[in-house]
């Protein structure tokens, strides 16, 4: 048989064997031709075409899958929507029989189910087709590598190679009988293979066509499904709209039903509450009524007993009053003279110190600020200032003389008033004695009339009848004449006796009547005199108040003038000159870097930061490879906004970016430069996004020591962690004005401010000591452990010869010490001074028990001097240990002690004073040994002896740690005695805690290296008692001031001294006011009994201020604001600091609170004011008035403070409403124009308890 004919058989070249071959060659030719034809049939479709067709089918299959999934998701969404709609519809039908079911819902559900079934069928067909494709691919691969029935093709020409094996040799050289048999087998196998491959190809082609048809049919079905989906969407939208309408109707119905139900429930709840409240009130009233009845019974019994004791107590009270008056007169005279001498001595010392400071300051100012060219102008100005100062001094002296005259007159009037009061008391006593005698006589006369039953008229009538009878019977009854005469004689005698007694009683009554008339006349005269004296006293009081107001006004004017002059002097001496320059152009700068000149005003400077380039490390370069990095840097300096360098491409970026900052070289800026760093971040840009790849810290502290451009490099650290060493950054910075000039000006300015503020603190220190004495005197000695309570006064006067660790800076010194078991106490910071004046006074109330006695005899008081400008903590400038054994022997410790640093070198001196207020009485069980007596400082008034260092086994005292301080100089604010214990003042930082084993260099050594100039003084008990009385009196009188804190803080040194002079001699009737106020005194909580009840105080808190968008927010002259609070005629209180003006819609927080005390003993006038408010009298200031005041800026101190807005809180309305104002916003009205609302003020006014207390006290007067 011949093989199948093939049209492409002639396409391939076939070797012609020729006609010389035998029959065997012809058979071989036919077999090879068949194999060639089958291979041609298999290779008719190329491998690339098959792969291309397969890949196309694969891609189309994937697309069909994606499309089918999308359609499946859409169908699922539609199904869920339909389920929700059906559930909602069923629910609405259950609730209220909603809309009827639509007719096409069932059809749509059936259609959706049919579509889902079709999708599942298509997915199954798709999987079947995919499996067929995979099997076809595997078959094609098998066909491409199909093994023939021969392991190798036999060569037609003998090449002479060895045969592979014997079996191969036997195949190639078969026996003669087997040769043609093998050829037949080959011819039978090859046709079957070709047929099989052709059939497979045909099947694959048919399947591919079927797949194409299926794809086309699926596309048509998908289009139909999409069309159906759109129809379903439209139907769903229509159904959704209908359901939404029905839902809205149902919701409206439900809302109306719920509202009506809620209203009914609310009404029932209200009625129930009212019923419960009324029943509770009725039960409470019944209980109160029963209690009142019981109390009335007990009161009747106690009233009878009290009336019996009242007479005895009145007699004792009269005797005690007489004794008290005599003792008060003696005490007042002695106390007044001693206080006057002490005050004058203190004033002299303060004025001498102030004169020395001013002289030093003036010399420094003259040497540093005045140049030779303008010397004459400065001299003229200096002379003018001296003339003005002399004029002001003369005016002050005249004011002081007038004040002293007024005070002398007031003293004489007081003496006269006391004399008149004493005379009035004597006359009242005499009047009471006469009344008592008259009462006794009247009682005796009544008793006589009642016992004798004889009346004068009856007696005269009886005598007349007897006489008539005698005349009638004279003739007939003569024998009875003798008897009648005897009877008449007896009657006459008795009559005469009765007449004599009657005349005596009448005479005594006349005498008492005349005496009572005289006493009445004398009392009238005394009343007239008292009225005239009180009138005179009221007139004098009014004149005195007017004069005081005039003096206050004059002092305010004088303080404003002095403040203006000080501002001018500071501007001339301390301020920098205007600095105008054109920046120099360096060779490495671009020409157009600066295009205009820069004007620096007084106190300003220009700080420049230049980022040059970034050098990446080798690790970064290896990691980046051939890619170019696109980078830029960002950093934020001080309180300015973020700066960004240009974006640079490359592995060696050079930015050459310079940023300039206009800064004020002040304390905060210098501290920021010295301590803080600036974070520079390196970012990599990716089209519109970026990521941070590295960061570093830029330091600028070297600018304090160098000038000009300072070049620095710093290391970059990777943020991701894989490359820690990222590279380096090169940068430079500088100040345009040289830094040494700015530092010098800053030091002088800080020193001048320190001198000014230290003078303000002196009168407050005096008030501190006096009020501490007053508060301590109120503590009962019985409350201590041993029954004895004493008070130790520690005064740190000054330090001299202090040196900072940085040689070019002056220290900001302050002293810290810890006494007994009290917390650490630190003084105020005196900036930029080698010889700081602290004048810090502190009182420590302690019980005189065994623990204190042991502490005084075995311990020393360590004083540590720290530098606030030193960056290293726990490093003190100097330290001294003062032995306290002299205090155990009731002696004063006063002297100048040498300070030692941590290396035991001399670091200056410190002057301290330690003394007891009362006589120190050691406890009964204490034993004084000879060893302890060695530490007593010997009294040497003439020779000054330095004590050698002595070693003692004294328990080591841990050094206090310096606390972090703010560099703001503030004035210590008064707080109440109760607030001092329970609520610490927010403006004073908390005391430092004890630190044990904090560092080896801070802990004190066991030896006492002490060299002192000691002046111990023995004080007697009588002198200390008199001193205590004087200090208490001074503290009570100093507490009364007609100047507000704002006026005190804004005034000058002279004005603060004048304030102390004005307040030093006020009325003794108001002395008790200091009991309700006291400065920050350390009082143990165990002996604190002066806490005020809520009914004895009014608390006012100013929380925050908010301004609307008005003219005030747009005015440039108004920059800082503070709040003033005033109640009736009481002194105004101000917030301690003025804050920047808030923008529209923003709040600024003051958090300032003030307490007005209303205790009956010390503040009856304030209670009278509240009584008048409750009576709703027409008072000028019946509400609490808050005034928003603008504070002029520092560079324009010649401007005056201006009232911007006013807010009110009416106390009568508060009492009527029955609730306090707690953090409520009240309207602030414009105080300058039409009175419109300009903002809100958030305040707290707690006065309800106080108003209720006043109302209960004066209920009868208020209800009448």
UniProtKB/Swiss-Prot annotation:
Coiled-coil regions, chain positions: 64-143, 196-268, 299-454, 488-555
Compartments in which it is found: Cytoplasm; Cytoplasm, Cytoskeleton, Cilium basal body; Cytoplasm, Cytoskeleton, Cilium axoneme; Cytoplasm, Cytoskeleton, Microtubule organizing center, Centrosome
BP terms from Gene Ontology: brain development; camera-type eye development; cerebellum development; cilium assembly; cochlea development; corpus callosum development; determination of left/right symmetry; embryonic forelimb morphogenesis
UniProt-listed Gene3D superfamilies: C2 domain
Region called Disordered, residue ranges: 979-1018, 1047-1093
Recorded GO CC terms: axoneme; bicellular tight junction; cell-cell junction; centrosome; ciliary basal body; ciliary transition zone; cilium; cytoplasm
SUPFAM superfamilies, A to Z: C2 domain (Calcium/lipid-binding domain, CaLB)
Main location: cytoplasm
Biased composition (Acidic residues): 1056-1080
C2 domain residues: 577-714, 773-897
Any one GO molecular-function label of the UniProt entry: thromboxane A2 receptor binding
Keywords: Cell junction, Cell projection, Cilium, Coiled coil, Cytoplasm, Cytoskeleton, Repeat, Tight junction
Tissue note: Ubiquitously expressed. Not found in heart and skin.
Pfam families attached to this UniProt entry: C2, C2-C2_1, RPGR1_C
Subunit and interaction comment: Interacts with NPHP4 and NPHP1; NPHP1, NPHP4 and RPGRIP1L are proposed to form a functional NPHP1-4-8 module localized to cell-cell contacts and the ciliary transition zone; NPHP4 mediates the interaction between NPHP1 and RPGRIP1L. Interacts with IQCB1; the interaction likely requires additional interactors. Interacts with TBXA2R (via C-terminus), RPGR, NEK4. Interacts with NPHP4, INVS and DVL2; proposed to form a complex involved in DVL2 stabilization. Interacts with PSMD2.
Function: Negatively regulates signaling through the G-protein coupled thromboxane A2 receptor (TBXA2R). May be involved in mechanisms like programmed cell death, craniofacial development, patterning of the limbs, and formation of the left-right axis. Involved in the organization of apical junctions; the function is proposed to implicate a NPHP1-4-8 module. Does not seem to be strictly required for ciliogenesis. Involved in establishment of planar cell polarity such as in cochlear sensory epithelium and is proposed to implicate stabilization of disheveled proteins.
Family: Belongs to the RPGRIP1 family.
Name the record gives this protein: Protein fantom
Species for this entry: Mus musculus
Gene: Rpgrip1l
